[in-house]
């Protein structure tokens, strides 16, 4: 699977988790879904920051530099929102639900920009290299999923 397809698949999984949170009936289900969502977001950001964004920068440094810088800023905003949510996650109340809604909006904004801008720039890498990059992303994602995310969102690398 090429890198952009793998990342789009992740985007869909995150959208699904936001929908699951919204439809969950019990607080326990909502908190479990939040933990899954948190892990997905942190791992997704790590594989982009460690592997995907550097490759996109190499493909077209001038165009990609601004795009990647903005994406990294958005990642940092999401991480800060996760830290806030981590502090609230002892109970699901209106503030927690509203913060999840804001997180969903921020993530969706980031996804749209990434898919419409960065992925277009990434096409300059070429199909074969995107396939190889996708393999590297999947391998790193598998490593991180197996290890689990036990760090707070703020300390996750950028």
Residue ranges, per PLM feature:
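Small-residue-biased structural context
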Residues: 1-158
